[in-house]
């Protein structure tokens, strides 16, 4: 009986299995490398977004109210805002202000209005004198069309769902009338007609609210008005 040698066949089979294992390992390694790279990029992107979300936002520095008659209600509100430290530019066109007196809650947005007849608008830079005057003297200091045109702020152009902007500090000219962007170092007043929005704010009234940017932490509004009004202009927060 003739015996056929099988050692060569076994050796070739083992080599084929080994090569197959190497190829599978190489493919698996490539998949792992690609996956880890993708996950690393996603993690980096998420980290940047989280950092921006935490660092960005609006800070409410103070809130001042105005009562034309000290025996009546507060009719106008000035909310002083600035960006949080490390915040990127904030588009004030996308900002919403929420106000509540416990019985009514309103949402307000910036609406740039220009009245050609009276040369007044809902925006002014470098205000002169009392910011609560019916007409606030100032300039269109960051206008795209005129660097220092005399254009005044008109409180009567505000409604119960809109607010205006009074720019106090804006070194880089980013807070423009139609495209206002709040950057580091800027200080802006959000002007609110609370008579139109909430029907006025009487004494002993608790007001809560937020200044909500498109991205980042909101600024908090929270105060209680005095039991009696002894001055026309009063600091509330």
UniProtKB/Swiss-Prot annotation:
One of its GO terms (molecular function) is structural molecule activity. One of its GO terms (cellular component) is archaeal-type flagellum. Keywords: Archaeal flagellum. One of its GO terms (biological process) is archaeal or bacterial-type flagellum-dependent cell motility. It is found in: Archaeal flagellum. InterPro entries: Flagellin/pilin_N_arc (IPR013373), Flagellin_arc (IPR002774). Flagellin is the subunit protein which polymerizes to form the filaments of archaeal flagella. Belongs to the archaeal flagellin family. This is Probable flagellin PH0546. It comes from Pyrococcus horikoshii (strain ATCC 700860 / DSM 12428 / JCM 9974 / NBRC 100139 / OT-3).
């Amino acid at each position: 009986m003739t015996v056929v040698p099988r050692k060569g066949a076994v050796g070739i089979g083992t080599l084929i299995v080994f090569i197959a294992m190497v190829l599978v390992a190489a493919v698996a390694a490539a998949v792992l490398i690609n996956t880890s790279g993708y996950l690393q990029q996603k993690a980096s992107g998420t980290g940047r977004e989280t950092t921006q979300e935490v660092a960005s936002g609006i800070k409410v520095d103070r809130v001042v109210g105005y009562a034309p008659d000290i025996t009546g209600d507060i009719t106008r509100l000035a909310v002083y805002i600035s960006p949080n430290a490390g915040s990127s530019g904030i588009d004030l066109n996308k900002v919403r202000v929420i106000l509540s007196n416990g019985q009514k809650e309103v949402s307000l947005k910036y609406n740039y209005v220009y009245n050609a007849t009276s040369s007044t608008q809902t925006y002014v830079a470098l205000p002169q004198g009392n910011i609560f005057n019916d007409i606030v003297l100032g300039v269109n200091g960051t206008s795209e069309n005129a660097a220092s045109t005399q254009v005044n702020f008109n409180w009567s152009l505000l409604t119960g769902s809109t607010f205006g902007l009074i720019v106090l500090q804006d070194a880089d000219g980013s807070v423009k009338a139609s495209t206002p962007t709040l950057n580091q170092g800027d200080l802006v007043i959000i002007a609110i007609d609370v008579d139109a929005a909430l029907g006025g704010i009487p004494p002993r009234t608790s007001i809560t609210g937020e200044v909500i940017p498109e991205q980042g932490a909101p600024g908090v509004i929270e105060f209680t008005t005095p039991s009696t009004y002894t001055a026309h202009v009063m600091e509330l927060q």
